[in-house]
Swiss-Prot record:
Protein name: Neryl diphosphate diphosphatase, chloroplastic
Cofactor binding remark: Binds 3 Mg(2+) ions per subunit.
Reactions mediated catalytically: neryl diphosphate + H2O = nerol + diphosphate
Residue numbers covered by motif DDXXD motif: 272-276
Protein residues bound to Mg(2+) 1: D272, D276
Originating species: Glycine max (Soybean)
Keyword set, alphabetical order: Chloroplast, Hydrolase, Magnesium, Metal-binding, Plant defense, Plastid
Length: 534
C-alpha cells in the first residue's frame, strides 16, 4: 500500500495546484471543480480549497445577485447556489423569483437545456420552509425534465435525467451513486479531469482496503464478544451495523471511529429485538429499570440473555466513555447513559402499547417513535468520536436533542413506516405511523396516508436544510455526519425503489470477499444480501 499512497500524494499535489489556480483566475470553473470533487467522494482532500472557492463565489453572488442571474447561464446560477447552501453559506432564493412571472418564456428558453434544468432542479432541493419560489422552480423543472424524457427516450443523457428526478444529489451519498452526471462538466477533456479521475480511483482503492480491514475487526469483535452464543435469536448483522458508520464517517482516516460506532449501533438493533419479540412486559420493565440505575444488581429475575446484554451494554458504554476521556479530557458517561435511558423508555412505551392492544394517536406514536429509532443514541456517540474540542456548552446542546438530530430521527421513522406500508412488510404487531393516522382519519385511503407521510419527510428535509444554514455551535463535521445519516436512510429502507442499493450491495459483497476468509465468507455473503431485506 505504500506505493499507492505515494502516487496519491503526487496526483493530489497536481490537482491542488490546478484547483488553487482556478480559484484565482476562474471562479465559475472552480465551482465545476468543487461539484466534481464532491460527486467523486474525494472532498476530504480539499476542505481548504473548497471553502476558499465558495467564499469567493459567495462574495460575487451576494454582491451582484440580480446582475449575476441575468448575465450567466442557468446552470452557472443554480450550481453555485446549491454548492454554497449545502456548505452553510446562505444565499437568497430571490435569484429564482423571475421564474414566477416568466414561466412561458422559461419553458421556451430552457425546454431543451438539460444541464440548466438539472442544475436548477438540484438547487431547489436545498430549499427551506417558506421559500415558495424554490418550490415553484423545482416543480417547473420536474415538469420540463419529464417532458424532455418523453421526447428523448433514446438520448445518451436520458438515464441520467431519470436518475436525477428519482434521486437528487442532496439526498444521496456520492459513494453509492453510479453517477454519469460528472461527464456533463465542461472540463471533461482537460488534464484536470484526468487527474481527478485518477485521484478518485486511487481513493477508491484505499477506501476499499481500509473498509475491508475494518470489517475484519468488526467481525472479530463480534465473535469474541460471544453475545451471539447467548442471545441466539437476535439478528446477527455486523455488516449492516457497520454500514452506517462506513457511510457517515466518509474520511478514510476515521477508521477507529467507524469501528467504535459500530458497537453501540449493534446494541440498538439487539435490544430492539428483545423488546419487540423476546421479552415479557415484566422482564422489559426490570431491564429498563436496570439501565436507569446503571447497575447489574437486582436483575436475578431476568433471563440469562438479558443479563448478558445488560453487561455488554455497560462494558461497551463505559469503555467508550473512558476512551473519550483519555482523548478529550471530558467524561461523556452521563450523556451516554441518558441517551440509553431515553431509548429504553421509548421501547418500553411501545411494549406497553403492544401488550394492551392500544393504538396511539399519530402524534403520540411519532413523538415516541422518533426516540425509538435509536438515532439520538448513535449520533451522541458519533459526536464524541470526532476531532474537535468538546465543552459542556456544546455537550448540553447535543444532550437535549437539537433539531438536526430530531429531524434525522423523524426522517428515519417515517421512511421505515412508509416503506413497510408500501411493501406490506408491517406485521401489524407494533403499528406504524400510517396505521395510527388512518385510525384517526377513517376517510383517508392508504395511498393518501402514504402521500401524507412523504410530505412530512419532505418538510423534515427542509428543516434539515435550515439547520445547515443556521449559525449554531454544532461543528460542521457533526452536521455533515447527521446529513449523511439522513442520506443513508433511503439506501437502508427504500431498497425496492432505489437503484443506489445495487451499488451498496456490490460494495458490501466486494468488501466481505476480502475481509473474511474460508467458510466464514459464505456466511457473510448471506448476511450482506439479507440485511437489505429485513
Amino acid at each position: 500500500m505504500d506505493n499507492i499512497y505515494i502516487k496519491q500524494a503526487l496526483v493530489l499535489k497536481e490537482v491542488k495546484h490546478v484547483f488553487q489556480k482556478l480559484i484565482g483566475e476562474d471562479p465559475m470553473e472552480s465551482m465545476y471543480m468543487v461539484d466534481t470533487i464532491q460527486r467523486l467522494g474525494i472532498e476530504h482532500h480539499f476542505e481548504e480549497e473548497i471553502e476558499a472557492a465558495l467564499q469567493k463565489q459567495h462574495l460575487i453572488f451576494s454582491s451582484h445577485l440580480s446582475d449575476f442571474a441575468n448575465n450567466h447561464k442557468l446552470c452557472e446560477v443554480a450550481l453555485p447556489f446549491r454548492l454554497l447552501r449545502q456548505r452553510g453559506h446562505y444565499v437568497l432564493a430571490d435569484v429564482f423569483d423571475n421564474l414566477k412571472s416568466n414561466k412561458k418564456e422559461f419553458r421556451e428558453k430552457h425546454g431543451e437545456d438539460v444541464k440548466g434544468l438539472i442544475s436548477l432542479y438540484e438547487a431547489t432541493q436545498l430549499g427551506i420552509e417558506g421559500e415558495d419560489s424554490l418550490d415553484d422552480a423545482g416543480y417547473l423543472c420536474h415538469q420540463l425534465l419529464h417532458a424532455w424524457l418523453t421526447r428523448h427516450e433514446e438520448h445518451n443523457e436520458a438515464m441520467y435525467v431519470a436518475k436525477t428526478l428519482q434521486h437528487p444529489l442532496h439526498y444521496d451519498l456520492s459513494r453509492f451513486r453510479d453517477d454519469t452526471s460528472i461527464l456533463l462538466n465542461d472540463f471533461k477533456t482537460k488534464r484536470e479531469w484526468e487527474c481527478l479521475e485518477e485521484l478518485a480511483e486511487i481513493n477508491s482503492s484505499i477506501v476499499r482496503f481500509v473498509n475491508q480491514n475494518e470489517i475484519t475487526q468488526v467481525y472479530k469483535w463480534w465473535k469474541d464478544l460471544g453475545l451471539n452464543n447467548e442471545v441466539k435469536f437476535a439478528r446477527y448483522q455486523p455488516l449492516k451495523w457497520y454500514m452506517w458508520p462506513m457511510a457517515c464517517f466518509t474520511d478514510p482516516r476515521f477508521s477507529e471511529q467507524r469501528i467504535e460506532l459500530t458497537k453501540p449501533i449493534s446494541l440498538v438493533y439487539i435490544i430492539d429485538d428483545i423488546f419487540d419479540v423476546y421479552g415479557t412486559l415484566d422482564q422489559l420493565t426490570l431491564f429498563t429499570d436496570a439501565i436507569k440505575r446503571w447497575e447489574l444488581a437486582s436483575t436475578e429475575q431476568l433471563p440469562d440473555f438479558m443479563k448478558m446484554c445488560l453487561r455488554v451494554l455497560y462494558e461497551i458504554t463505559n469503555d467508550f466513555a473512558e476512551k473519550i476521556y483519555k482523548k478529550h479530557g471530558f467524561n461523556p458517561i452521563e450523556t451516554l447513559k441518558r441517551s440509553w435511558v431515553r431509548l429504553l423508555n421509548a421501547f418500553l412505551e411501545e411494549a406497553h402499547w403492544l401488550n394492551s392492544g392500544h393504538l396511539p394517536r399519530s402524534a403520540e406514536y411519532l413523538n415516541n417513535g422518533i426516540v425509538s429509532t435509536g438515532v439520538h443514541v448513535v449520533l451522541v456517540h458519533s459526536f464524541f468520536l470526532m476531532d474537535y474540542s468538546i465543552n459542556n456548552e456544546i455537550v448540553a446542546i447535543v444532550d437535549n436533542v437539537p433539531q438536526i438530530i430530531h429531524s434525522v430521527a423523524k426522517i428515519l421513522r417515517l421512511s421505515d413506516d412508509l416503506e413497510g406500508a408500501k411493501s406490506e412488510d408491517q406485521n401489524g404487531l407494533d403499528g406504524s405511523y400510517i396505521d395510527c393516522y388512518m385510525n384517526e382519519h377513517q376517510d383517508v385511503s392508504a395511498e393518501d396516508a402514504q402521500r401524507h407521510v412523504a410530505h412530512l419527510i419532505s418538510c423534515e428535509w427542509k428543516r434539515l436544510n435550515r439547520e445547515i444554514l443556521t449559525q449554531n455551535q454544532l461543528p460542521s463535521s457533526f452536521t455533515n455526519f447527521c446529513l449523511n445519516a439522513a442520506r443513508m436512510v433511503p439506501l437502508m429502507y427504500h431498497y425496492r425503489s432505489n437503484p443506489g442499493l445495487s451499488t451498496l450491495q456490490e460494495h458490501v459483497k466486494l468488501l466481505s470477499n476480502n475481509a473474511v476468509a474460508g467458510a466464514e465468507r459464505h456466511v457473510v455473503h448471506i448476511l450482506c444480501l439479507q440485511f437489505v431485506i429485513e
